[in-house]
Structure formats: structure tokens, C-alpha cells
Amino acid sequence: MTRLIIPSLLFLIVSCSGSKEKPLLPEEVSPDVYRVLLDNDDVKVLEVTFEPGQSDNMHDHYPVTFYLLQGGKAQVTLPDGTVNEREIPTGFTGHNTEKVRHQVKNIGENTIKIILVEHKNTHPASESGGTLILPEEVSPDVYQVILENDDVKVLDVTFAPGQGDNMHEHGVITYYGIKGGKLQNTLPDGTVKEMEVPDGFVGHGNTIVKHQMENVGEDTVKVIIVEHKKLMPVKE
């Protein structure tokens, strides 16, 4: 996976805007490009699809974490008329802490597809939630950290058929299933639940969860998890 480490590429994808006016929501000004998958008080998850030659309209984003499901060549125009072009690879992952305004066009020959997790509530955590059993530490063969900063941690999760992880914990997370399948979820009290999850499944958890997962199907399951470091879990 490609991490967001190049300043010029950060400027391309997430260019800052100091505007105080009413935000131009991408799903409202360009509904043919942006589809809302999930929206609550904390986050908004958007599926973004640019066909070759397709453009959106000038719009704003909350602070955002993004993952390129399908990369390509994009042109980004800023409110001041500045234009940038860049080849963005599949798997490219990034995060911006500021609100942004820009317009994007696919100037390549293939479809570009992006998952955006916009952070609507970014207040600092006011109290410690304690030390969690981190999945990437107890099951590094399943969980790979592809981006981490003070705000978020992004995990690439891959379960081969028959593969399971070890008991672990999550804080506040948002997740998107790149490739679904049949999973078995085991809780600390021994409760077991099987579930069929489709490609593109999306969700958000605001409590601390402790569990163990196993792929009991015949296909590889792949998930992207965004852990929110600045959101306190709700106490059950």
C-alpha cells in the first residue's frame, strides 16, 4: 500500500480553504460522482467514482481520510485557479486535518474510485480509554497499518479463506469492506455468530469492541478500518 508522504501529493488531493461560507457538499453539487454510504454525528462515508473524462463541481470536504480503490490520473483545480495533475496509485491512503475546497477531473483512461471518511466531529478525547489489545500487534499477518498520525490509524485487513485473528480490541472505528465473504465473530464470553457480508459493506462503531474473527468462507475478505483517535468510545 502507498502511504501519504509526499507534500506535493497532499496538496493535490486535499487543498485548504479558509472559507466561512456555507459548505458546498460534494454529494449535493455532484451527485453523479459522490454517493453517501453512511452519515452520522461523527463521520460521513462517501463512495467517489470518476469515469474517464468525468469532472465534479467545486466543493468542500470536512477533515478527511481517503483510500484509493482504483487509482488513475487526476487534475485538481483550486479556488484561485491553480491546477495540479498527478498519477495516483491504487491503494494510496491519506489524511487531511483541515477543511478543503477543490474541483477534480479524471484525465486518465480508467475509472478512479475512492472511499472518503469525512470527520465531522474532531474534538480531542477528554479522558483515557486505557490500553487496548491492538489487532496489528496480536495478528500482524492479518492487520497492516498503512497510515497513522495523531488523528487516525488506517488498517488494511486481509483474511484468507480459513484464516482467523487473535482476540483483540477496537476503539471508535469506521470500516469499509473492499471484498466481502463469510465471517465468524467470537466474543470473550464464547458467543459465536456467523455472518455473510457483501462487497462494499460499511459501518461505524462507537464503543470498545473485543472479539476474534475468522474467515469461514471460500473467498478472501478484505477490509479497510479507520480508527478515530480523537473520538471517545461510548460507555455501554
Give the role of each language-model region:
Residues 71, 99-120, 207-231:
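Ligand-binding loop in jelly-roll beta-barrel domains
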Residues 61-79, 170-189:
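Glycine- and acidic-residue-biased ligand/ion/polar-headgroup-sensing regions
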Residues 53-56, 82, 94-105, 162-165, ...:
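Histidine-centered metal-chelating micro-motifs
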Residues 30-55, 66, 136-164, 175, ...:
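A short glycine-rich, His/Asp/Glu-containing loop-to-beta-strand
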Residues 39, 80-98, 189-207:
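Short acidic-glycine-tyrosine-enriched beta hairpin
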Residues 12-15:
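C-terminal motif of bacterial Sec signal peptides marking the signal peptidase cleavage site
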Residues 17-19:
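Bacterial signal peptide processing site
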